[in-house]
C-alpha cells in the first residue's frame, strides 16, 4: 500500500512542474501586455496637444497635456510602471526556468501591488480630468473644453484605455503569483 502512495506522489510532481511552468509563461505574457498598455498610454498622453486656428496670428488657444499637472502625473506614473515591468521581465524568465523560486515571487507580488496602486492613482486622476474636459462642472463654472479641442480630448480619453487595461493585467499578475505560491 505504501508503494502506491509514493507512486501517486511522484506522478503528481511532473504535473505540478508543468502547471507551474505554464503559470510562469502566462506571467511573462501578461507582463508584455502590461508593458504595451502602459507605454502606449504614456506616449499617447505625452504627445497630446492641439492649437485652435484663429483669424489672427497673435491670439492662439493651445491645449497640452503638460498644462494640467494631473495629466503629467499620469504620464510619469505610466512611465514608472512600464520601466518596472521591463525590469521585472528577467525575474519572470527565471520563474519559467526555476519554478520553485519562492522569495522572488513574494517580491514580485509586493512590487506588483505597489505598481498597481501607482497606475490606479494616475489613471483615476486622469479620468477625473477627462470627465471634466468632456462635461465641465456647472456649479464651479468650469466649461467643457472638448467642444473646442476635440482631437485633444479624443487622445486623452484614448490614453486611459491602456492604463486601465494595465490595471487589470496587474491584478491578474498578483493573483497568478499568489496561486503559484499557494501551489508550493
From Swiss-Prot:
One BP annotation, GO: cell wall organization
Keywords in UniProt for this one? Answer: Cell membrane, Cell wall biogenesis/degradation, Glycoprotein, Membrane, Transmembrane, Transmembrane helix
Question: Which sites does the entry annotate for glycosylation?
Answer: 49
Q: Kindly state one GO CC term assigned in the UniProt record.
A: plasma membrane
Its biological purpose: Regulates membrane-cell wall junctions and localized cell wall deposition. Required for establishment of the Casparian strip membrane domain (CSD) and the subsequent formation of Casparian strips, a cell wall modification of the root endodermis that determines an apoplastic barrier between the intraorganismal apoplasm and the extraorganismal apoplasm and prevents lateral diffusion.
Q: How does it assemble?
A: Homodimer and heterodimers.
List all topological domains (Cytoplasmic): 1-24, 94-105, 181-184
Entry protein name: Casparian strip membrane protein 1
Topology class, membrane = Multi-pass membrane protein
Location(s) in or outside the cell: Cell membrane
Q: Name one Pfam family in it.
A: CASP_dom
Q: Which positions, given as ranges, span the membrane?
A: 25-45, 73-93, 106-126, 160-180
Glycoprotein as a keyword of this entry, yes or no, is: yes
Q: Which residues lie on this side of the membrane: Extracellular?
A: 46-72, 127-159
Q: Which family does it belong to?
A: Belongs to the Casparian strip membrane proteins (CASP) family.
Q: Does the keyword DNA repair apply?
A: no
Which PANTHER family does the UniProt record give?
CASP-LIKE PROTEIN, CASP-LIKE PROTEIN 1U1
Amino acid at each position: 500500500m505504501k508503494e502506491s502512495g509514493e507512486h501517486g506522489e511522484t506522478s503528481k510532481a511532473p504535473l505540478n512542474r508543468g502547471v507551474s511552468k505554464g503559470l510562469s509563461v502566462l506571467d511573462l505574457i501578461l507582463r508584455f501586455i502590461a508593458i504595451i498598455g502602459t507605454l502606449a498610454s504614456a506616449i499617447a498622453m505625452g504627445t497630446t496637444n492641439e492649437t485652435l486656428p484663429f483669424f489672427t496670428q497673435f491670439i492662439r488657444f493651445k491645449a497640452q497635456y503638460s498644462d494640467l499637472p494631473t495629466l503629467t502625473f499620469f504620464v510619469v506614473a505610466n512611465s514608472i510602471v512600464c520601466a518596472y515591468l521591463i525590469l521585472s521581465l528577467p525575474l519572470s524568465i527565471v520563474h519559467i526556468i526555476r519554478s520553485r523560486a519562492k522569495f522572488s515571487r513574494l517580491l514580485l507580488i509586493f512590487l506588483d501591488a505597489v505598481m498597481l496602486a501607482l497606475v490606479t492613482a494616475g489613471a483615476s486622476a486622469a479620468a477625473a480630468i477627462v470627465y471634466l474636459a468632456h462635461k465641465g462642472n456647472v456649479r464651479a463654472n468650469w466649461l467643457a473644453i472638448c467642444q473646442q479641442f476635440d482631437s485633444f480630448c479624443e487622445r486623452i480619453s484614448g490614453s486611459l484605455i491602456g492604463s486601465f487595461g494595465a490595471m487589470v493585467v496587474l491584478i491578474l499578475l498578483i493573483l497568478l503569483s499568489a496561486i503559484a505560491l499557494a501551489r508550493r
